[in-house]
Each structure stands twice: as structure tokens, then as C-alpha cells.
Amino acid sequence: MIQSITSQGLVLYNRNFREDDKLVKIFTEQAGKRMFFVKHAGQSKLAPVIQPLVLAHFLLKVNDDGLSYIEDYHEVKTFPKINSDLFVMAYATYVAALADASLQDNQEDAPLFAFLQKTLELMEEGLDYQVLTNIFEIHILTRFGISLNFNECTFCHRVGQAFDFSFKYGGCLCPDHYHEDEKRCHLNPNIPYLLNQFQSIDFDTLETISLKSEIKQELRKFMDQIYEEYVGIHLKSKKFIDSLADWGQLLKEENK
């Protein structure tokens, strides 16, 4: 069944199909993720809006049993600051890929669409893209069926303690219960505290965010452990971010 809809959408990626055609994956607000066929993409009027991380209102023909089609578009929004910075672009591409991985095709998820859009808008405004990515990662865990409590001890349920995390018990340990897991993570207590704050943060009121580089490195390492242990996905965009740690700093120094 094919139906016509008008929906805001974010282009996740495109890929070549035959000689001059393209398949374009768009996360739509009204109809979830869909694959759209664009014929003669190089000469098409749609060429400007089928690039990754372009946001627009689309007039679409949606097909539940096959490829869908883009009929028209308006109110195009791009992210020039994101696109002009390799590092920000890498993280923006990763959060979009993470949203893609967390959601089945054709499944509507307007809250996730809004959250992804707001994350990109805050990156565009210049807020710390690494921290925004951590916030996105911790929130989207529920889409993978994972719910973690960083607010209280798994054993005594006390709050406000210098928590560590235990993968054995799937939760936090207070100092009185560190001994329950000899292989606990030995985290800086600021890490569980921050993740607890991230879980309840409201992006609509977020104006600034700043963390020391050492804390950001610890957050990145722990989030990688969480995703490896509980989610088990290995995205190309995440591998690229990891490679930035090796050669990205050299690039930054050359551009000074």
C-alpha cells in the first residue's frame, strides 16, 4: 500500500544504485525510517536535500512493502558548522547511525526523532559535541532494551554515595558494598554521578555544558564498555571516531 504524507525528515545516508540513481535512507517524524528511491539523482531537483544530515519537510509517497519516493520538499535546514568541522561531523554522524541502529524500519518514533534533531541543533550551536554524544548514548540505551540505574546502590539502595559500577550486578555499588565485586570498574565517582544527571537532563533548557578533558576521556571509555557489554553493535561511524583519537590530534595541531 502506497500513501502520500508530508513529514519532517532527516537524511541518514545515501548510496549509489545503478548508474545514476540513489537509495536514500530518511528518518521521518511521521513514518519512521524509510528507504527512498531517487532516479537520476545527479540531475534531480532533489540533489541538494538527499545529502546526510539534511533536515527538511518532505512530501513523500510511502510504500510499506518496498521502496518509497520523494515527491517534493521545503523548509530545508542544514548544519554548516557541523559540516565544516571533521570532528563534530564524525560525532554527529555517529549519533545518527546510533538512532538508525536502535529503531526498526517503518517504525514511527517521533520522540526519538525530536531527540536526535535537538542533539544535532545543540552541536550546531557549539555545545560540547562529545558530551552531547554521551548524553544521547545513555538515553538511547532504552531503545536497545537496556535500563541502568546510576542513582542508588544495587544492594542497599542508598543514594548520594561515591558509586562504582559492577557489570556483574548490572548496577552501582556504594563504598560499603565494593567488596561484592572484585572486578568492579574502579570508576572515578564523578562518572556514575554524571551519567545519573545525563539520564534526566532536559535538552530544551540546556544552554551550556563543560567538562574537563580527563573526565570526558573516562566517560568515553566507560560508555564504550557499556555498549560492548549490553548492546554489542559495532558501527563504522564509531570506528571512525576511535581512529580520530589516533590521528585527529595531529590534524588539529597542523591546523593551528
Feature-to-residue mapping (PLM):
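Non-catalytic alpha-helical scaffolds and adjoining flexible linkers that form interface surfaces
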Residues: 1-256
